[in-house]
Amino acid sequence: YYSILLNPTDEGPFNPFSIREIRYAVNFLVDRDLIVNELLGGFGTSMFSNYGSFSAEYLRVLDVIETFQFRYNPSFAEKVITDELEIRGAEKIDGVWNYENEPIEITFFIRSDDPVRKAIGEILSSELEEIGFVVKKEFGDLNKAYVVVYGSNPAEQKWSLYTEGWGSSGFTRYDSVALAQMYSPWFSSMPGNNNPSNWNYENDK
């Protein structure tokens, strides 16, 4: 499985991904059909949550997934991002978003040891640059990712996005683990890793 992990910290310099609506908008910048058909040669299927269409749990969450209407729609993504940034006082100057007179720069950690993830990172970087962000691309393997992404305090903002990859070991009905693993901070796999010395993501109550 392939996914994009975002750093949602609201500490430190202005971070556009601290804004929930902008994180949501990123879903519409990902051309899943392109990834499946071109990068995977048709050997895959689009996913919109951690439960794919072949998961035993998929039918239980399908009605919720369909309400989001996720699809490749960069115009919609740009509108959402523009609205949210302008509300917070950002302005676009010569095609680049600025906040408090500084360009908004994001760091995209892209796995260079996996050609599929490298391509996904390059494509999404172009989409984000088209929106008006300054994208700093940092390439590395899993060892480097353990240090930069999983081993750092999100508040340090050493990364903004990461081309994540993961796998499933079985076909499980009533999966009690995957939901917590992907969406709960107490499982210790969210940004911050539940380390009390780090900034940690918390679900809205």
Where are these regions (language model features)?
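Short helices/loops that flank or line small-molecule/ion binding pockets
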Residues: 21, 122-131, 144-159
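A bilobed periplasmic-binding-protein/Venus flytrap-type ligand-binding module shared by bacterial periplasmic
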Residues: 1-22, 29, 38-39, 202
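Ligand-binding clamshell of periplasmic/extracellular solute-binding protein-like
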Residues: 2, 159-179
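Short, flexible loop/turn elements at secondary-structure junctions
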Residues: 8-10, 30, 43, 55, ...
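Extracytoplasmic/secreted cell-surface and envelope-processing proteins
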Residues: 4, 13-16, 116-119, 145-148, ...
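Beta-sheet entry/capping signal
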Residues: 3, 24, 106-107, 134-136, ...
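Extracytoplasmic/peripheral linker and loop segments enriched in polar/acidic and small residues
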Residues: 24, 36-39, 70, 136-146, ...
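Append "and occasionally in soluble cytosolic enzymes with long acidic Gly/Pro-rich linkers
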Residues: 18-126, 130
